[in-house]
Regions:
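Flexible, active-site-adjacent loop/turn segments at secondary-structure boundaries
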Residues: 1, 8, 42-43, 67
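Conserved Nudix-box catalytic region and its N-terminal flanking loop in Nudix hydrolases
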Residues: 1-26
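Active-site segment of metal-dependent pyrophosphate-handling enzymes
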Residues: 25, 29-65
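Nudix hydrolase/Nudix homology domain
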Residues: 1-2, 57, 62, 67-118
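Short linear capping/connector segments at secondary-structure termini
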Residues: 5, 40-42, 117
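Short capping/connector residues at structural and topological boundaries
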Residues: 8, 15, 50, 72-74
């Protein structure tokens, strides 16, 4: 097993941000309060299909800490930023987390410019 954030594939007719919300609800039972596009895209090579995937990263504020875990997962935990950085296996996921954290903790206009109206 490995630890990672909520993730999933875009279904036909979905926008990437809609996929993030659907996966959030399916995997955790949580609802989004606020959402923004992070200043980072993650990418990885997938041998099956011989393709490079480019994945947008989103920051989502949720309505609760009470998670209803889906059957595709075995556990969850809430952790602080440093613990999350140390726990994530993939560099792309760490960089995405760092981008979200940096946008949340800095007082600049990127949060306003990248906000997604729900």
């Amino acid at each position: 097993h490995l630890w990672q954030g909520v993730a999933g594939k875009i279904e036909n007719g979905e926008e990437a941000w809609q996929t993030a919300i659907r996966e959030l609800k399916e995997e955790t039972g949580l609802d989004p309060l606020n959402m923004f596009v992070a200043d980072h895209t993650s990418s990885f090579y997938e041998v099956k299909g011989n393709r490079i995937n480019i994945i947008p990263v989103f920051g989502i504020e949720v309505n609760s800490k009470e998670v209803l875990l889906s059957e595709e997962h075995v556990d969850y935990k809430w952790v602080d930023f440093e613990s999350a950085r140390k726990t994530l296996v993939w560099n792309g996921q760490r960089k995405g987390l760092e981008a979200v954290y940096e946008m949340i903790t800095n007082s600049d206009d990127r949060m306003r410019w990248s906000k997604i109206e729900l």
